[in-house]
Amino acid sequence: MPKPVLLPSSSRFGEPVGELRPVGASLSSTLPEGKLSPNDDHNPADYEGTFYAQIGGRETFAKLANNFYESVAKDLEFRAMYPEQDLRPAAMRLQLFLEQYWGGPKTYSERRGHPRLRMRHHPYVINSHNRDVWLKHMRVAVDSLELAPMLETTLWDYFDRAAHSLINASDTPPSV
């Protein structure tokens, strides 16, 4: 039986980005294993020697993104930070971004342009509390992968540094 993979989303004007689903609904779909879309011609051999390949490629990043957003969906307070009712498009964006960052397919940039992580996160209030909650959910997802220690450390170091770099608000409101 094929492993679940998220349905693709699109950022192009006029194209649907997902279907409405209840908060907490399963993020999996019925696409064939490793496919981001029915026309995806992903060839794992193209990425030999990259961290993307070492960690397990598309399957691993799909599991990471799915597990992260399934954890987020259960946290109603933190879930409110995400404007989309359906978290699958957000999970797909995370998966594609991480695949590209770690040496895999460039699908993220092909669909969405340059990652511009700080710009894309600017509309959201990210203080140290929100960073810590995000890291808590990402820790659950990373632990679910059961990676070799060196791979886990490399991946976690990136998430920790990225989360710290995205802080754009103080924890206390400015005094009036």
Residue ranges and their predicted role:
Residues P2-V176:
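Core of compact, soluble alpha-helical bundle domains
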